[in-house]
Amino acid sequence: MTAPSQVLKIRRPDDWHVHLRDGDMLKTVVPYTSEIYGRAIVMPNLASPITTVDAAIAYRQRILDAVPAGHDFTPLMTCYLTDSLDADELERGFHEGVFTAAKLYPANATTNSSHGVTSVDAIMPVLERMEKLGMPLLVHGEVTHADVDIFDREARFIDTVMEPLRQRLTTLKVVFEHITTKDAAQYVRDGNDYLAATITPQHLMFNRNDMLVGGIRPHLYCLPILKRNIHQQALRELVASGFTRAFLGTDSAPHSRHRKETSCGCAGCFNAPSALCSYAAVFEEMNALAHFEAFCSLNGPQFYGLPVNTGWVELVRDEQQVPENIALADDSLVPFLAGETVRWSVKK
């Protein structure tokens, strides 16, 4: 029997889906991402969404100003799609290297998505332009109709939105973000080279029982919501198979403690401090460490047409305890796995 690995050395990873917020929150959370990842796809759903080139440039600078000295980190900016977005502005941002991708939020699907798209038809000229440019479309894949159960939103989205869109725009590059269901895993697996997916650590590690049985755990509440065990297992099997169009996207989404631990709490897991170690634990449990580097560091650049990072990151088998909380101005953040012990650590 082979002894378990004590060190995992991988090309420096990227985070293909992260929320860095703004203001004091931005300054607090950026170092947890910039310390480990070479690049990150930054979500545009600020209180005033990022819909113009100038807004993206200004936000990128605020992010860079929050990166500690010695961290080599490149934020990759995204444009928030709205029904009224100017396709020429989007194209200008893409050609100038400001926008790496554009994000489709169905209206009211998640945090700060009230400005989102009411129907795909409303933005079809923009999507057609993106297809011609080879610009990736990042999709929060849930319908938001009042008559659709929250646990069925993703599966319904595939049938009613995603598949018709991909049939219409056959060469549009699409990232089905933070997939959570067996349906989505199978859909992406069966898709062509224009379709990829990101998967979060929480959806690989937990299911809805973990969030709801024995008391509600608000720090596991995120959108798309955790699903039943069969869906969690499908995601684990997808990444363990070495499937090359699935890659790391933490969806790290910080909210202050008082906005999570309340009668109507916000959705999102702040997992940046422990995400890479969490992924490593999952791959180890699935006897799939041979595919860990590709998931973290190779598959994403391949899909986006970007070079692989030149640096390296080492994880060591050294247990560490995740902090119970992290100071935030006049409040605090409770990180994913707060107070728990993880068996891998990133070597400093």
Curated annotation (Swiss-Prot):
Keyword Protein biosynthesis set for record: no
Pathway involvement of the protein, from the record: Pyrimidine metabolism; UMP biosynthesis via de novo pathway; (S)-dihydroorotate from bicarbonate: step 3/3
Record-listed Zn(2+) 2 binding positions: K103, H140, H178
Positions of the catalytic residues: D251
Species whose genome carries this gene: Salmonella paratyphi B (strain ATCC BAA-1250 / SPB7)
Obligatory cofactor(s): Zn(2+)
Protein name per its UniProtKB record: Dihydroorotase
Top enzyme class: hydrolase
Binding site for substrate: H19, L20, R21, N45, H140, L223, H255, A267
SUPFAM superfamilies attached to this UniProt entry: Metallo-dependent hydrolases
